[in-house]
Amino acid sequence: FQDLGVNTLWISPIQKQPDSSWVEWVPPNRTFSGYHGYWPIEPRKIDPRFGKSEEFNSIVKSAHQTETKVILDFVSNHVHQDHPYLRDHKNWFGTVNLPDGRLNIRQWDGDTRLTTWFDEFIPSFDFPSAPVAINQVVEDAMWWMGEYDLDGFRQDAVKHVPHSFWKSLTRSAKIRFPEKNIYQIGETFGSDELIGSYVNPAELDAQFNFSIYFNSRGVFSSDQSKFYDLGNVIAENRSTFGPIHLMDNITRSHDKLRFSGHADGQIELSDCILARWYF
């Protein structure tokens, strides 16, 4: 890693996942599993398919010996329906039905941004109505950081979680681990203004820079965009985040198809729809 210039490892979620497969709510109603780690069924247990606790400790220790940081992907927005929090504290979660009778599933933006479920079996926390749930999930995050000597988190689905949660988590991390230079980066699909609203000393250090990602992908993989357009996006980006920031410029995301798939011209719209991941 050092020869490659890598100084930080981002580990995907390792919390215990369900054993069985589940049918997706939207057509074509695919059957798939929680292999990706984003369907937690236990708050503080490593999925045995990913390894053992002592093995993860060894990985982090080995990384630190080479001055390499380790951040863990943490899921705060939701759990799988087999999670004990849903079983024991149903009042911590919102309902899947909207007042007009529609299902509040994958309604990513607007008034439902903070309440939508990712699927019928992936309930989202209702943090504004259940402050005790904020305290519990924050404590879980602190447990992972302390138990495995982590250097920070990649925070999942940031825009679906209220600011009050992120402020509570960041405040707790700074108080509990004052000796650590904790780094938190978030994932938010949305406008620069929405992405930037979570980046401040009280919440996150950075987010993935999706506006530049999408535009640069169009420039370098096809003739859909021009360098002039990318230049405008970069200028707008700097206006929002400033010339000096920790925003993460990426070449790919595990939520999207690989750059090479776009560049070789083999991907059709239908393939993009079929290949989507929902976390």
PLM regions and their residue ranges:
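Short amphipathic alpha-helices and their capping/turn segments at secondary-structure boundaries
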Residues: 1-5, 60, 233-240, 274-279
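Substrate-binding/active-site clefts of carbohydrate-active enzymes
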Residues: 3-148, 168-182, 186, 193-195, ...
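Short, basic, glycine/proline-bearing loop/turn elements
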Residues: 41-45, 255-265
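Active-site-proximal helices and loops of the catalytic beta/alpha 8
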Residues: 60, 64, 68, 139-142, ...
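Catalytic metal-binding/acid-base residues of hydrolase active sites
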Residues: 75-76, 158, 189, 255
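Flexible glycine/proline-enriched surface loops and loop-helix/loop-strand junctions
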Residues: 118, 149-150, 255-258
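Active-site rim elements
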Residues: 126-130, 154-157, 259-272
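Substrate-binding and catalytic surfaces of secreted/luminal carbohydrate-active proteins
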Residues: 236-239, 250-261, 271-278
